[in-house]
């Protein structure tokens, strides 16, 4: 049983760590956020903001708000999904300016090509492990994290008046 913790979070884990540190100062002694900086709670929820900003073109977080449609797309061919998403998120994908399609009614994977050959930084066994895990769990749990943003925004009004007071650091990379 521990009395204090240091939190480290990447991507979705970063805002969860930042907010936990702000809410639980007695228990969190330091916090590290990777890729996503600390931001205060906005006047509108992030999903409402995304819907306004991306009214006429595709944005993955808006797409993930739909129920069942993203799950069907992502779970149709797990190997293809995992390969495309890892490539899309890689430095090579970024350098090649891989983007999802900008058509409003498209799916996430529509604008992402399959990588040409094997990814240099990822073993085939790692892709297959991810395929097996998502075959068991599906994508609903991961997508529900995106769908919970409005609920978080409504229930965490207390964050309006809180700051990160612990030692903290934000780390980002170029690619």
Can you name each region flagged by the protein language model?
Residues 1-8, 12-175:
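Flexible "cap/lid" subdomain of the alpha/beta-hydrolase fold that forms the substrate-access gate
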């Amino acid at each position: 049983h521990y009395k204090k913790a240091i939190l480290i979070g990447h991507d979705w884990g970063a805002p969860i760590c930042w907010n936990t540190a702000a809410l639980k100062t007695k228990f969190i002694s330091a916090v590290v956020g990777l890729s996503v900086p600390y931001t205060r709670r906005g006047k509108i929820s992030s999903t409402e903001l995304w819907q306004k900003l991306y009214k006429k073109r595709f944005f993955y977080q808006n797409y993930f708000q739909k129920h069942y449609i993203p799950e069907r797309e992502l779970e149709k061919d797990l190997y293809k999904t995992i390969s495309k998403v890892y490539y899309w998120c890689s430095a090579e994908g970024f350098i090649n300016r891989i983007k999802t399609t900008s058509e409003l009614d498209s799916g996430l994977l529509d604008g992402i090509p399959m990588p040409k050959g094997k990814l240099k930084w990822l073993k085939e066994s790692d892709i297959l492990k991810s395929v097996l895990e998502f075959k068991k769990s599906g994508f609903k749990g991961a997508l529900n994290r995106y769908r919970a943003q409005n609920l978080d925004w409504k229930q965490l009004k207390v964050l309006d008046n809180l700051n990160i007071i612990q030692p903290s650091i934000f780390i980002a990379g170029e690619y």
